[in-house]
Design a protein with these regions (language model features):
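A generic structural signal for beta-strand entry/edge sites
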Residues: 3, 34-38, 52-56
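Short beta-strand-to-loop capping motifs
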Residues: 8-10, 59-62
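Ser/Thr-rich, low-complexity intrinsically disordered terminal regions
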Residues: 26-44
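C-terminal structural segments of small proteins and small subunits
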Residues: 61-102
Length: 106
């Protein structure tokens, strides 16, 4: 299993979280509220946490190919959705991240 995290500074973190999860939910399973999101791609998973100043992504995937794909999909979508704000996603890989699915969101 491979893990990575990215912290993106933005005052619109909740807006981007909801937009990303709503978009992904059209093709894969996504659960979210205003401040937390969980996307279960067929090739990996992504946890999102938003507050007033940042959007934090935590991802995991079983192998190198799927890991690269999750990183690309999340990065590409946020960078396109952010338009003129020009947000950048810079991944930091970790040997382990405690990335858990959201259980208390309807």
């Amino acid at each position: 299993m491979r893990y990575a995290q990215a912290v993106v500074r933005t005052s619109k973190a909740s807006r981007y979280l909801k937009a990303l999860c709503n978009h992904f939910d059209r093709k894969v399973t996504a659960t979210y509220d205003d401040n937390r999101g969980w996307v279960q791609f067929g090739f990996g998973e992504c946890r999102m946490d938003a507050d007033d100043t940042q959007l934090v992504f935590g991802i995991r995937a079983e192998d190198d190919e799927h890991f690269a794909r999750v990183m690309y999909v999340v990065k590409d979508h946020l960078e396109r959705f952010s338009g003129d704000e020009g947000l950048q996603v810079d991944w930091v890989e970790y040997p382990f991240l405690d990335i858990q699915p959201l259980t208390n969101i309807p």
